[in-house]
Amino acid sequence: MEVLMAERADLVFHNKAIDGTAMKRLISRLIDHFGMAYTSHILDQVKTLGFRQATLTSISLGIDDLLTTPSKGWLVQDAEQQSLILEKHHHYGNVHAVEKLRQSIEIWYATSEYLRQEMNPNFRMTDPFNPVYIMSFSGARGNASQVHQLVGMRGLMSDPQGQMIDLPIQSNLREGLSLTEYTISCYGARKGVVDTAVRTSDAGYLTRRLVEVVQHIVVRRTDCGTIRGISVSPRNGVGVTERIFIQTLIGRVLANDVYMGLRCIATRNQDIGIGLVNRFITSRAQPIYIRSPFTCRSTSWICQLCYGRSTTHGNLVELGEAVGIIAGQSIGEPGTQLTLRTFHTGGVFTGGIAEHVRAPSNGKIKFNEDLVHPTRTRHGHPAFLCHIDLHVTIESQDIIHKVNIPPKSFLLVQNDQYVESEQVIAEIRAGTSTLKERVQKHIYSDSEGEMHWSTDVYHTPEYTHGNVHLLPKTSHLWVLSGSPCRSSIVPFPLHKDQDQMNVQSLYVEERYISDLSMNNDRVRHKLFGWDQKRGRVSYYSGPDRIISNRNWDSIYPLILHENSDLLAKRRRNRFIIPFQYDQEQEKELRPPGIVIKIPIKGILRRNSILAYFDDPRYRRSSSGIAKYGTIEVDSIIKKEDLIEYRKTREFGPKYQIQIKVNRFFFIPEEVHILPRSSSIMVRNNSIIGVDTRITLNIRSQVGGLVRVEKKKKRIELKISSGDIHFPGETDNIARYSGILIPPGRVKNTESKFKNWIYVQRITPIKKKYFVSVRPVVTYEIADGINLATFFPQDLLQEKNNLQLRVVNYILYGDGKPIRGIFHTSIQLVRTCLVLNWDQDRAGSIEEEEAYTSLAEVRVNDLIRNFIRIDLVKSPISSTGKENDMAGSGLIPNNGSDRINTNPFFSKAKTQSLSQHQGTIRTLLNRNKEGQGESLMVLSSSNCSRIGPLNGSKYHNVTKESIQEDPMISIRNSLGPLGTVPNILNFSSSYHSITHNEILFNKYLLPDNSRETFLVPKSYFMDENRRIYNLDPCSNIILTPFNLNWCFLHHDYWEDTSTIISLGQFLCENICISKDGPCVKSGQIIIVHVDSLVIRLAKYHLATRGATVHGHYGEILYEGDTLVTFIYEKSRSGDITQGLPKVEQVLEVRSIDSISMNLEKRVEGWNERITGFLGIPWEFFISAQLTIVQSRISLVNKIQKVYRSQGVQIHNRHIETIVRQITSKVLVSEDGMSNVFSPRELIGLLRAERIGRALEDDICYRAILLGITRASLNTQSFISEASFQETTRVLAKAALRSRIDWLKGLKENVVLGGMIPVGTGFKGFVHHSREHNNISLEIKKKNLFDGKMRDILFYHREFCGSCIPKNFHDTSEQ
């Protein structure tokens, strides 16, 4: 006792917290020094001490103990400010989505981390005895991360795909979460709870499978006599590798003598302790060969020396020890442990932050610019990258600071920039590389439109048939707005003139800027083609009359005044835009409601309707029946007005009435169409009052008689107001049933009717009939609605052979029910303007057509719009066979003789337009003072350029006349395009009406203009501000809502005219005028003298290496993938990946890259080894090499996962398992011997022995079995049956008459025998002669094995050339 006291006095007193790792070390040192019994006694005392102290403290935890860190408020505010700036950068296209996500995550992660670091000192200063503080740093359950969620902030969470949600949870659990935060955190938290349970069971099952594989492996011999070994060499590096080197060596047995120079420092079969390892490290001995379970020659057990020391007591393992089961549990148990440890952070994300270099003081920074080159940081900021050490000087007033910036760092400031003290000037690349994985992030288009990019994208796709383009450098991708029009499946449109159609079948004509008089086959081929790629047929209207004749399917709206607001109505996809004028001019203009109809090609036949006017006097808001009364109708012309292709066909005839007495009648009634299932609260033929409830949520608007009619799928309920008469015998009102009666016609009735009435006789079932007398609304059709009030006077005069007539249409037939849709009005009469002209001569082959187009003339600063109507003759080809030709799908040969197919862009070479008569007539905007009328009529004979008009203050008009070459003409007219009258020369090659300019982008001109007939990649605009893309495979329509008008102040315009060019892209908030920045981003498509038209566009930034999907000019729909970024993401290092990863490796699933690599390696080895050794050895050696290589690779992979978690498992446990996975080979079919059948699985050692015994080649190849398969391919069928598939295994064993020698543990447990381990082991050892003669056998084999070893395993040069280094180096982790 005194001795002990004296020793204790000499001991050093350590006042330091001891954690789990330190405790492990202490216990292992105690065991080394004092042995097991004494150590357990000491540990008991430690346990007692701990429990006693814990009971004395008696900590309780209350909600008031959770104190939030005071600095949280400004930290969160600061992070939000940074996020807002980042959002703006993203919006303006300075950073792309990945950079934004990355930076956002780092901002919030840094905030969260800073809060977590603040938490500890805050508690220590304010409340050191706070229970939360004591618990969280006690090392027991609960750690800083969990406490941080209670009192700091929860931070960023993962979504179900494992991606980061860049909306952080700013609250902590003490403050409580908002609804959004709760929803975001639900997934992570639930995942934590569920995963803990699931992974625990997974780890348990993994343990079970592992034990199943190796349960029969017991130490049964002292030495198997192997001379193989695994080479381990200490690396030159220190730190990690040295630690792993020590762990690998301790407890192993040497396979060879180790020499230092000529002196032997360790002998074969000597076990290695810490002292010997240190000598190896200091002496830098050459590779040391150790024995391992891989090298053991025994088939179904293991020898003492190959296993090495036991981990429990530090001596060589005892005979009879069940090392297999220990190995299985050693690997399986940490899985359980790790699982439990992982998810208690509730799915909260963790990341890493780079180190920063800050300026020591205020001053000007200077560095050598030649040593750096510009780059982008991973957050998208501009920076300089330095490859070598960079010396930076910061000059303040009185002192010069020198800062050294390490290589591969980012410099975030420019040369000669003024920096403030503590400003971040550089970012240092993190020294340790974390686990990273490459992730793809797709960016999707959020609008419809057309893809556009600059020259920075490779226009040729990466693969020959793909549409994937690579970006060589950072650039913007633009999506130009516009609503695409999908083509129909029907190759030929079956619609007639003015039909209303669904959008799906709307055909958009492709406009070609090609000279149609050239008989070019390629032109004809392009005009009409099947678009097979998209699985639908696009219909391209060609120059042929028949095809174009069938293509009148859409009414194009006209925008007649640039500053007018557009009110667009879509009625059954017929685009009709009524005009809204400036308020002060409204009184003078024609009444609103006139709509001008121009067919899709702008071609009017005779008797075409040019405009129509809906008079508000003939408008009803209720349903009813139209009646023509007893008036004689001269002629009724029917036009089929509506065709729908949805299995039903409805015809709404248009009736053109020319009547002697211009009067018709409307019988109002209230109609409700109800579903068949609805419950009706009124009876048929009953009389109800106003506001009576009909169904649960519908009330009647009028009172009267109710008629209920039940149809197949619906119920029709009509309420007709009026009087009910039960006629007596004297009354003759019943005779007039079903007709209109004028006032005073009915006699002998009690009441006289002052207005027209409609009599209806109703006979209910089994009841007396009665008569309903209904009031009638009478409409007089005003005979001469004076259209001169709508149009200027000269428009109606017959001039130049063109006539306009006014015609009234009644839109509903006699007796037809008119159904009003809820809250919409019904137009009963439409006044139309019909265009007509005299045919030249009766039998003319050429039929005349009227071409309409729009011209714009500026008079006295008012923009005037003209409709221009030209008569053009066109050849008719075989009118009789019209339908056949259309059905055959052939374009006749004379199809390209017709010149002026396209009214908006005609290139007339054979016929000049001046041969035809034409008028340009004004339509609106008559000046208040009536000035400028002299310009109103222009014929094409005086279509030379008209200079600036009187009173016009713009003089920068382009003066050049248009050249013959269209390319030059385009460039010439691209100045400020505000040519005032904008009626250009009709030269023989180029004819333009306003807004039809071809737009060029400087990027778009191809290198070789071989396709001469097609002007390269341009846009064509018609007068409706619709833009046609000349790609034969796509249709796009721009509605006016996709355009943005930008008015420039005139004085400023002259200075900036150089900046703005047609086709240029403007980003958002770029200043182009005095009024302020341009708010929207887009492409300039029209340049006027004082205004621009910008086609709206969204732009996306893409950096180098990104993949662009789709082709240039391709139509994109919402949600299409635009671009894919590939970026590196640090992998979360927890066992989320760990446990499944371990399982994946052990089950040898091919998802992982390991099996792929192994296959490639094996092929390489086979080739090389055949060269070295010749054919006979090929199979034997390549199988051996494959097995050795894959074993080491598997061990390293499993160790990597566990080490990343700080879990240490001795290599020999993993080796024991891996040995079983790789212990089988597959017999090949070629060179097959008589012993085994092809594709049979046999043990590797057994194959070698039988091969030697028979002196015959058995060809086999290495195979990796998963742990499950290995468990089902053992020597014991009882063990297999008790694991899985019991019936199948037992049935097979019975059929094959298998014998179970009961060598393993499990089969003995199942049958209740003695287990062959521990004390029961001795009964199973049979000392055979083979065992006694081991030393002799070694001598015989030694010569050959030595040579083999030199060739295969340890020869440095050879191994270096064909085997990766980790083949002979377990130290590479």
UniProtKB/Swiss-Prot annotation:
Binding site for Zn(2+): 224, 296, 303, 306
The UniProt record lists the keyword Chaperone: no
Cofactor(s), names only, from the UniProt record: Zn(2+)
EC number: 2.7.7.6
Predominant subcellular localization, coarse grouping: plastid
Any one of the GO BP annotations: DNA-templated transcription
Name listed for the protein in its UniProt record: DNA-directed RNA polymerase subunit beta''
Record organism: Amborella trichopoda
